[in-house]
């Protein structure tokens, strides 16, 4: 579909343990990822999530990723205490029931299942709120959202009265960015 399923969850633990706790599922109105390359070909990252058709077991989506949580696990603090880190997994909103599988890469390079849950796209528990419209200004580009890269600049530190200055600063930054490779070819 052309919508997104957003799964918010937390990773918790210490230097030697990792647990996953679900927070929420949310339907978002647009899918900004590829409609063609749904299976991650690179097998990169310390974590991977996969979406399987619940009836056939067929893999229909996968993505590898790394987390700040796993970096924190290597610190001295992680040897003395536990912490919780928020994470998000997004994937095309499923048409039918699916199984979500989150795996962690071991020291041997192999993935093992860390968390699994069934998802029914018709579930009452999936939040379906329409997001509030936000004020945004397009600086450059007009490409297909499935094949384009979106870069958002947040006006943090600018007051409402300084929005024109903010837009001019962003335009200037975009000019610098699009003057450099590889962005100069893909504007």
What are the language-model segments listed below?
Residues 1-87:
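N-terminal prosegments of processed precursors
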